[in-house]
């Protein structure tokens, strides 16, 4: 494989850091540049180690990041920044790169149809980085009856329902399987993250929401499954290690990453449970809003505001779904373009703060 150039949007985040480590292991990739938000010290350390001449802070907006992509036109762009802005950057990355690795869920949640329209006009491969979607990509086969996405259930999965309102950020951030950023770890506990992944799977593979089933799988070994028409079930198993899907996305369709160990099938029990929608009220909203990008954008924006306020201990954990539901209910209409989505995102954040003030 010839050396490929890459820009990492979100180089100081969990996915960004692990991507840098994977690239060090693989070789054959040259990091041209990256973005960071506020962690300048870590960004400078990465830049010095890898001799990056293009390092952009996004703390004041994303215009410079867009300019960097236009100037560098890397072979690969990794979009690994949280929030709605990932949609804007993903659209630009599709324009300028041959391959876009998408780790930011919000891009497809809020603007899936925009991403797919852009892909029609560009010779770009969009590759998922999420463990569930890269797993599904590897086992996908038609015709099928149903696909399965698994969920750990988050840090509070074994708490009594009547105690959930007492959960503090330190409790919620103790994820039982994965090591991730703060927002996504909270989203795992509410299963908002899994709702995002259902939307993503629908967009990536053009699957109706009704054919995507989520199961609680506490062991974190099975990442996805597919039920085929002849009663066969295919499952994808692997360690809870994001470096594996990152490496696969970088080298697809080849496997270049070496990790000579596998889950112990003899001494591991695999269990599956249906989702308790009483425990995860924000999750069940996905079925009501799946066809409405305005409400999906409101869902994302209100969640982001609610999670931040929970992490700052301004609201209770059980207030998060209440904020989301009220904002989504108050969001009406359809969207025509990116401008409409940006406006809804802005309005939804404002509404979320208003709801929080009234709790």
From Swiss-Prot:
It catalyses: 2-C-methyl-D-erythritol 4-phosphate + NADP(+) = 1-deoxy-D-xylulose 5-phosphate + NADPH + H(+). The keyword NADP applies. GO terms for molecular function: 1-deoxy-D-xylulose-5-phosphate reductoisomerase activity; manganese ion binding; NADPH binding. SUPFAM superfamilies: 1-deoxy-D-xylulose-5-phosphate reductoisomerase, C-terminal domain, Glyceraldehyde-3-phosphate dehydrogenase-like, C-terminal domain, NAD(P)-binding Rossmann-fold domains. Its cofactor is Mg(2+); Mn(2+). Keywords: Isoprene biosynthesis, Manganese, Metal-binding, NADP, Oxidoreductase. One of its GO terms (biological process) is isopentenyl diphosphate biosynthetic process, methylerythritol 4-phosphate pathway involved in terpenoid biosynthetic process. InterPro entries: DXP_reductoisomerase (IPR003821), DXP_reductoisomerase_C (IPR013644), DXP_reductoisomerase_N (IPR013512), DXPR_C (IPR026877), DXPR_C_sf (IPR036169), NAD(P)-bd_dom_sf (IPR036291). Pathway: Isoprenoid biosynthesis; isopentenyl diphosphate biosynthesis via DXP pathway; isopentenyl diphosphate from 1-deoxy-D-xylulose 5-phosphate: step 1/6. The keyword Disulfide bond does not apply. 1-deoxy-D-xylulose 5-phosphate binds at residues 105, 131-132, 152, 175, 188, 193-194, 197. Disulfide bonds: none annotated. Mn(2+) binds at residues 130, 132, 197. NADPH binds at residues 12-15, 38-39, 106, 181. Its EC number is 1.1.1.267. Catalyzes the NADPH-dependent rearrangement and reduction of 1-deoxy-D-xylulose-5-phosphate (DXP) to 2-C-methyl-D-erythritol 4-phosphate (MEP). Belongs to the DXR family. This is 1-deoxy-D-xylulose 5-phosphate reductoisomerase. The lineage of its organism: Bacteria, Thermotogati, Thermotogota, Thermotogae, Thermotogales.
